[in-house]
């Protein structure tokens, strides 16, 4: 699947991985609808992208993925702006291990991903008037392994893997032109890692040592894996693991 001329919807697009995903899509000729709750940061990114790629191929709308109404409005606005939808990246995520942040983490990381996936299917399934496409849900290596520093974060990321693979197995999904894949990066040099604190991480000092032990990947490097999941039509229900020490590796799974 070439992304040239395709329309992409990206959550958590203002900084870090989300920004890198938008950038690589734009570099390859896609049109991008950015969403984020951080409007100030998003406007800076938007101006940067519009200066580099043009004002007509990228836009932004403030959107909280934990809000059903805001997500519905953002998807509707994407179709109205660009005429359709081909690529959805459910990327928005936070850390949160203490009250009340852990519930917010579940709302954003998991519920936001589920809501974004349901809306993506609604807009992209060919039997519902869509033209097919691909969904990439952003999990983590913490979605495949235990993480003593962030058990709630770990739980949300495990759930994203299970949910995404399950929906990818629906016969109606692939039969109507939609693929769903999962990206599981290890530690990345983003604000989520640099801002580790007691409210969003347990045993912060040990966690920081662990995070830097094997080195941090750049968002641009992780974006290369993201683009692979978008463009490779043979990938559906695939889990791509990425790490500084082991590169890109597809996770072996069973369908049982």
Predicted regions and their residues:
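Substrate-binding pocket helix/loop in short-chain dehydrogenase/reductase
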Residues: 98-106
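Conserved glycine-rich Rossmann-like NAD(P)H-binding loop of the short-chain dehydrogenase/reductase
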Residues: 28-44
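Residue(s) in the substrate-gating loop at a strand-loop-helix junction
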Residues: 140
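Active-site-adjacent segment of SDR/Rossmann-fold oxidoreductases
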Residues: 28, 145, 166-178, 200, ...
